[in-house]
Amino acid sequence: MRVQRPPTLLLVFSLSLLVTAFSKPLYVPEHCQNYSGCMLRACIKTAQADTAGLYTNFRIDVPSAESTGTQSVSVDRESTSTHDGPTEHVTSVNLFDVGYSVN
């Protein structure tokens, strides 16, 4: 006669999903560890938005100056700049080329 055991694997899996749903995120940035509740969630979302372009091919939509639509801009670290118009050009000046006096 076979003895039926409770479905332990299913029970463990469902309990782990339940615990994960109500727990803190796995990684909390160091500067967010003193917060709780809404402040913790806001701090984590800010940290995710600040680092999104560092590790992924992240694109954001910004308002376009030429039209009423938006323009998609890549904020990936490895992306090239897409400046269409003239940009401000600043020439570097060596400190030895500038005359100054010490009083």
UniProtKB/Swiss-Prot annotation:
What spans are recorded as compositionally biased (Polar residues)? 65-74
| Primary localisation category | host cell
Q: Does the keyword Signal apply?
A: yes
Signal sequence bounds: 1-23
Q: Where is the composition biased (Basic and acidic residues)?
A: 75-87
Q: Where in the cell is it found?
A: Host endoplasmic reticulum
Q: Which GO terms describe its cellular component?
A: host cell endoplasmic reticulum
Keywords for this protein: Host endoplasmic reticulum, Signal
Residues annotated as region Disordered?
65-89
Q: What is this protein called?
A: Non-structural protein ORF3
